[in-house]
């Protein structure tokens, strides 16, 4: 059965290459509002939901609204890397020279985040998709990696996006459930 004809659709909205399509709903507006707030205040954000709920679509839409002269967006979905490979990849994506040793990668990542935020006056936005697969070693390191001036400054936005199991990994409770169609999404 051709559902495009049956439902009077002009195209198949479920294709992966249909990224220019965005259906604005109350829930999507709320997600975008909260992501905008995260961009303004900096720090860590978390976006979780069941597969197909529109996490990547919302992030893509949000990134399109960010001013390139004010934000440098780094997107990675390589959350299954070893910690050192993850940091080498992050250093490279930020535009820094990656190193072999973890402490060296920490240093260059922090230097690049500081350079971007202080010298270039750009807020680094680091988006880690599929973060539910990220190792606890990397998550534990984030507290150290994003500690600036004795934990008195936020130099970047870090958005972790993934399945609801990420909440359990982080041991967080859901503070605001934006939308659910059934109890299975809780």
Task: Show which residues each predicted segment covers.
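Conserved small/polar residues in nucleotide/adenosyl-binding loops
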Residues: 179-186
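Conserved NTP-binding/hydrolysis module of P-loop NTPases
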Residues: 11-12, 71, 81-100
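A short, basic N-terminal segment
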Residues: 1-41
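Walker A/P-loop nucleotide-binding motif
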Residues: 43-61
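Conserved Walker B catalytic segment
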Residues: 114, 121-160
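Conserved catalytic segments around the Walker B and adjacent sensor/switch elements
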Residues: 68-78
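Short regulatory helix/loop adjacent to the ATP-binding pocket of P-loop NTPases
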Residues: 166-178
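Conserved alpha-helical scaffold flanking the Walker A/P-loop in AAA+ ATPase domains
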Residues: 104-119
């Amino acid at each position: 059965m051709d559902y495009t004809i049956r439902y009077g659709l002009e195209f198949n909205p479920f294709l992966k290459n249909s990224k220019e399509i965005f259906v604005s709903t109350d829930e999507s507006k709320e997600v975008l509002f909260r992501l905008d707030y995260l961009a303004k205040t900096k720090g860590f954000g978390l976006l979780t939901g069941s597969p197909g709920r529109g996490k990547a679509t919302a992030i893509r839409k949000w990134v399109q609204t960010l001013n390139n002269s004010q934000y440098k967006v780094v997107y990675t979905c390589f959350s299954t890397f070893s910690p050192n490979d993850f940091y080498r990849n992050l250093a490279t994506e930020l535009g820094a020279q990656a190193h072999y040793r973890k402490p060296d990668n920490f240093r260059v990542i922090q230097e690049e985040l500081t350079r971007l935020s202080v010298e270039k006056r750009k807020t680094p936005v680091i988006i880690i998709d599929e973060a539910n697969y990220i190792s606890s070693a990397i998550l534990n390191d984030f507290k150290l990696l994003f500690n600036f001036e004795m934990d008195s400054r936020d130099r970047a936005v870090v958005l972790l996006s993934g399945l609801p199991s990420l909440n359990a990994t982080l041991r967080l409770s859901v503070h605001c459930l934006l939308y659910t169609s059934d109890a299975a999404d809780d």
